[in-house]
Amino acid sequence: MGDDRPFVCSAPGCGQRFTNEDHLAVHKHKHEMTLKFGPARTDSVIIADQTPTPTRFLKNCEEVGLFNELASSFEHEFKKASDDDEKKGAAGPLDMSLPSTPDIKIKEEEPVEVDSSPPDSPASSPCSPPLKEKEVTTKPVVISTPTPTIVRPGSLPLHLGYDPLHPTLPSPTSVITQAPPSNRQIGSPTGSLPLVMHLANGQTMPMLPGPPVQMPSVISLARPVSMVPNIPGIPGPPVNNSGSISPSGHPMPSEAKMRLKATLTHQVSSINGGCGMVVGTASTMVTARPEQNQILIQHPDAPSPAQPQVSPAQPTPSTGGRRRRTVDEDPDERRQRFLERNRAAASRCRQKRKLWVSSLEKKAEELTSQNIQLSNEVTLLRNEVAQLKQLLLAHKDCPVTALQKKTQGYLGK
């Protein structure tokens, strides 16, 4: 046995024998490889596990700051507008130009622009007598709240004003188009109610009443505008795509239009002489972005106060219409439509299969004809080879052939 395997491993504790030296070299190499992996050293550097798991990915994102909210341009504009309002308010009581006063343009035979300005400016009421003579001691209207509200006759007719705690963007310009003469005239009530406007410096300015103006009953907005601005940091009602406010305690656009219409109608009916309408300062009917700063008020042919029309610019979204339609359908009708669709699909599939089969048949015919042509060529070539062989055998003993063989033999040598 030892003669068959003369090569012994010299490693301690290993007495294996091998037939040749190559096997022994491979075995020793295995010993060297195992000896290199000794016990783990305690002073070696511990490598941290950096496997990219989802938890570590989210942690890295939080450390870098990817989950932080980006600074919005609207918030920057809001802060800038609030700083400007604070600077203007701290400048002095006399340096007040009502930064967000809207202009009302009443279109009649000739367009007239009425710009409401502070009481100390001479252009505030160009056609009004002194304010103290026209002031009536009936129920005054204090313009303080930032949004319009509906009031009944005999109560406060209009609430519009400026609130320094809720600064707004540059106010929209309202364009009021006078209604055609075929519409009804709004009469004034028995008792005229004066309007008092609170300015930003704390002064109260009584506004004179004006002649009755025909007001429209439908307000068509050129663009969807939310009644309450959604400012970051200030809670507000969520607004969906069509511009309507969520029904959690907030009015829908139709209710807001009815409110605004009723307020304007009551205000105009309470005005019976003077320079026209009274406009609040910053928070007017609708607070909008600068690019949404025009509200066009038009009168339809036959308006209905209880059912305000919706302009084409505000399409009502039909959510879930397809689902409701499928629910309302009869099951037999649904099954019939399903079978019709199946029949149409089956006919299309049969047509495709027929075209495929016809193309395969054409290809098979072409290949068959080509095969027949090739077989004919092979037969002709075989016949020609046979004829040539016969000629060669016939001229086997010819002197010319013998001479050729001799010359070929000499050339071969």
UniProtKB/Swiss-Prot annotation:
SUPFAM superfamilies: beta-beta-alpha zinc fingers, Leucine zipper domain. Residues 334-354 are annotated as: Basic motif. InterPro entries: bZIP, bZIP_sf, bZIP_transcription_factors, TF_CRE-BP1-typ, Znf_C2H2_sf, Znf_C2H2_type. Disruption phenotype: Mice exhibit abnormal behaviors and increased 5-HT receptor 5B (Htr5b) mRNA levels in the dorsal raphe nuclei. They also exhibit reduced adipose tissue mass, showing a role for ATF7 in adipocyte differentiation. They develop severe ulceration and inflammation associated with increased epithelial apoptosis on dextran-sulfate sodium (DSS) exposure and were less able to regenerate colonic crypts on irradiation. When combined with loss of ATF2, mice show even more epithelial damage in response to DSS. In addition, loss of ATF7 leads to telomere shortening and chromosome instability. Residues 114-126, 307-320 have a biased composition (Low complexity). The modification Phosphothreonine is found at T51, T53, T101. Residues 1-285 are annotated as: Transactivation domain. The keyword tRNA-binding does not apply. One of its GO terms (molecular function) is DNA-binding transcription factor activity. There is a cross-link at K107 (Glycyl lysine isopeptide (Lys-Gly) (interchain with G-Cter in SUMO1)). A zinc finger (C2H2-type) spans 7-31. Residues 332-395 form the bZIP domain. On EGF stimulation, phosphorylated first on Thr-53 allowing subsequent phosphorylation on Thr-51. This latter phosphorylation prevents sumoylation, increases binding to TAF12 and enhances transcriptional activity. Social isolation stress as well as TNF-alpha also induce the phosphorylation of ATF7. Phosphorylated in proliferating colonic and small intestinal epithelial cells. Sumoylation delays nuclear localization and inhibits transactivation activity through preventing binding to TAF12. RANBP2 appears to be the specific E3 ligase. Pfam families: bZIP_1 (PF00170). Stress-responsive chromatin regulator that plays a role in various biological processes including innate immunological memory, adipocyte differentiation or telomerase regulation. In absence of stress, contributes to the formation of heterochromatin and heterochromatin-like structure by recruiting histone H3K9 tri- and di-methyltransferases thus silencing the transcription of target genes such as Htr5b, STAT1 in adipocytes, or genes involved in innate immunity in macrophages and adipocytes. Homodimer; binds DNA as homodimer. Heterodimer; heterodimerizes with other members of ATF family and with JUN family members. Interacts with JNK2; the interaction does not phosphorylate ATF7 but acts as a docking site for other ATF-associated partners such as JUN family members. Interacts (via its transactivation domain) with TAF12 the interaction potentiates the transactivation activity and is inhibited by ATF7 sumoylation. Interacts with TAF4; the interaction inhibits the TAF12-dependent transactivation. Belongs to the bZIP family. This is Cyclic AMP-dependent transcription factor ATF-7. It comes from Mus musculus. The gene is Atf7.
